[in-house]
Amino acid sequence: RVTDSAASGTALSSGQKTYNGAIGVDIDTLNVKTMLEWAEEKNMATGLVATSTVTHATPASFAAHVDYRKKEWQIAEQFAETEIDVILGGGKTFWPDELIKEYENRGGQFIESIDAQLNPEKRILGLFAEGALPTVNEGRTPTTTQMADMALNKLEQNPNGFFVMIEESQVDWGGHAN
């Protein structure tokens, strides 16, 4: 049996094998500690960058705990309650206005443009498309490099170091299309 992005993302982020579709849980649906959560315990800065929705299987596997990968609304709710310093990618459709307000009330800054003026004292949630970002051939803005630069510039300010997961999600999708 071939693994999927949720199970492989969970294995990559935690060292724990699990079933296809699982995000941050083991085969008994018990939460597993991820590298991102470990980094936060060490007072390191943390970030997630993806060209898919930020709540998609691979990025979600580093910070969420749900029994099935398609629960992107629930994953967004969990993200809003975390202390992740930078979350950049697509998926605004899974972040209703009330959830974005909750995120902002918890000390976050919501942006929809890579050129937004950032508040250095706030965590960043950048959602640049309703769903996944457009492909490069479709004129993707922002680019993976632009998002990575924004994340790294923010995260490197932490004297304890940082952990960031950067996924060029659409490489995976290209593989599925072949």
Predicted regions and their residues:
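Short secondary-structure boundary segments
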Residues: 36-40, 48, 151-154, 169, ...
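Short, hydrophobic/amphipathic alpha-helical packing segments
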Residues: 29-33, 145-152
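Active-site His/acidic residue clusters
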Residues: 57-62, 132-139, 157-178
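Formylglycine-dependent
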Residues: 83-84, 120-135, 139
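N-terminal catalytic scaffold of extracellular/periplasmic and nuclease hydrolases
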Residues: 1-94, 99-117, 122
